[in-house]
Amino acid sequence: MASGSADHEDLRYRQCAGVMLANREGLVFAAQRIDSKNLGAWQMPQGGIDPGETQQEAAMRELEEETGVSADLADVIARMPYPVRYDLPEELQGKLWGGRYRGQEQHWFLARFTGTDADIDIAAHNPPEFSEWKWVEPDELPRLIVPFKREVYRAVVKEFRSLI
C-alpha cells in the first residue's frame, strides 16, 4: 500500500502502554526484538491496549507477556502524566498494524522490579518477541532504540530519571 502524506495524516495513532522496569541498582530493562535483530533494536516492554483495558492494566499485561515478570514483582511507582507519540517512517507505513495507524501514542509507567534476574523469562510468551535482554543505564536507552522512537525514549527517561 503506497501512502502519501495526506493519507498518512488522516490515520490515527495506535494506543499503546509501556513499562520502564527499574531494578534496585537503578538500571532499566531493555530487550532486543527478534524481528529487528539485524537493526540492533532494543526496547522496553510495550504493546497495544486491548478493548476494556486500562492503560496500566495493558502495561502490566505486556510486561508479563514479554518478560515473564508478573505484576506482583513490579511495583508501579509513577505514571507519565501525558502520552508521547511517534510517527512511523515512510518505509513502514502500511506494513505494521494492517496499515491502520500512522504511529503510536504511548502511555508509560515506571515500575520497580522486586524479583531476581531468574524471574525474567523472555521466552514466556509464545512466540517470544525478544531474543535477549539486559539491564542498562537509563540514559543509554535512547541510543538503543530504533531512530524513529528516540524522542519518545528521551521523554520517558527525562520524566522518570529522578525516580529510578
Swiss-Prot record:
| Gene Ontology biological process terms, A to Z | nucleoside phosphate metabolic process; ribose phosphate metabolic process
Q: Which cofactor does it need?
A: a divalent metal cation
Entry's InterPro entries?
A: Nudix_hydrolase (IPR020476), NUDIX_hydrolase-like_dom_sf (IPR015797), NUDIX_hydrolase_CS (IPR020084), NUDIX_hydrolase_dom (IPR000086), RppH (IPR022927)
Q: Does the keyword Hydrolase apply?
A: yes
Q: Its Enzyme Commission number?
A: 3.6.1.-
Task: List keywords of the entry alphabetically.
Answer: Hydrolase
Tell me the domain of life. Answer: Bacteria
Q: Which CDD domains match?
A: NUDIX_Ap4A_hydrolase_plant_like
Note one Pfam family from the annotation: NUDIX
Short sequence motif Nudix box: positions: 47-68
GO MF annotation, one:
guanosine-3',5'-bis(diphosphate) 3'-diphosphatase activity
PROSITE patterns to which the protein is assigned, alphabetical: NUDIX, NUDIX_BOX
**Where do the Nudix hydrolase domain residues begin and end?**
12-158
Q: Does the keyword Hydrolase apply?
A: yes
HAMAP family hit by this protein: Nudix_RppH (MF_00298)
Q: What does this protein do?
A: Accelerates the degradation of transcripts by removing pyrophosphate from the 5'-end of triphosphorylated RNA, leading to a more labile monophosphorylated state that can stimulate subsequent ribonuclease cleavage.
Q: Which family does it belong to?
A: Belongs to the Nudix hydrolase family. RppH subfamily.
**The name this protein goes by in its record:** RNA pyrophosphohydrolase
Q: Which organism is it from?
A: Erythrobacter litoralis (strain HTCC2594)
Question: Could you read off the lineage of the organism from its UniProt record?
Answer: Bacteria, Pseudomonadati, Pseudomonadota, Alphaproteobacteria, Sphingomonadales
This chain is encoded by the gene named rppH
